[in-house]
Amino acid sequence: MIPMFKKKPLIGMVHLKPLPGSYHYNDNFDDIVDFAIKEAKKLEEAGFDAVMIENFGDAPFKKEADKITIASMAVIAKAIKEEVSLPLGINILRNDAIGAYSIAYVVKADFIRVNVLSGVAFTDQGIIEGKAYELAKLKKLLPSKIKVFADVHVKHAYHFIDFESSLLDTVERGLADAVIISGKRTGKEVDIEKLKLAKELVDVPVIVGSGTNYNNLRILWSYADGFIIGTWIKKDGKANNEIDIDRAKKIVNLANKLKMC
């Protein structure tokens, strides 16, 4: 079971519009904040267990975010905390663990996602190195109950260390509180064999990070402790669209039935 949650939570994604400093920013930050709040409220209304914000619209991404990105996300996170009662998570693309923890600390968020906590990933941003040491040092300086959810073989990347070694290093040496297993790209389904292996080898919760939908949730249910859902709950199942409240409610209703089994 994931700390702070009941049985097998659904974590809904709020994919933020392009933020100040990013290539596609449209020069209206207030609208971005309002949109994020509305998306988070949809997730709460639908019955999701948590919300996670991510600077999804900022492509092309930097390895670590600019200060204006961190400041913008802090404002958005604070606004959501004031309007929505669900646990809140922070993910800063491409791999800004320090920025994410810093925001979570000051706004009293509940968890962060780190794309590369341990090891090395070869990505469209170049070579990304793990941030476990830097994050552990910051956590020592600023103690909190913030949990670290870390990807193993994060999507949109190539990996030259085998999955099993990466998994064990992320937990044993990177000190992840939970691991995230995803498909190869946003919205792509996860390899169930990897979920099975993760459940076998580590004692921390295993979360599905991509590709969960109404049709496969029942199958995935037995192999995971939680689900991060973004693409499927959007209008027409497209990640760049806004959340479709009916799709969101539909998958929550199914999850609630599965929780009773």
From Swiss-Prot:
Alphabetical list of NCBIfam families matching this protein: thylakoid_BtpA
Protein name: Uncharacterized protein MJ1115
Membership in a protein family: Belongs to the BtpA family.
Lineage: Archaea, Methanobacteriati, Methanobacteriota, Methanomada group, Methanococci
Organism the protein comes from: Methanocaldococcus jannaschii (strain ATCC 43067 / DSM 2661 / JAL-1 / JCM 10045 / NBRC 100440)
SUPFAM superfamilies hit by this protein: Ribulose-phoshate binding barrel
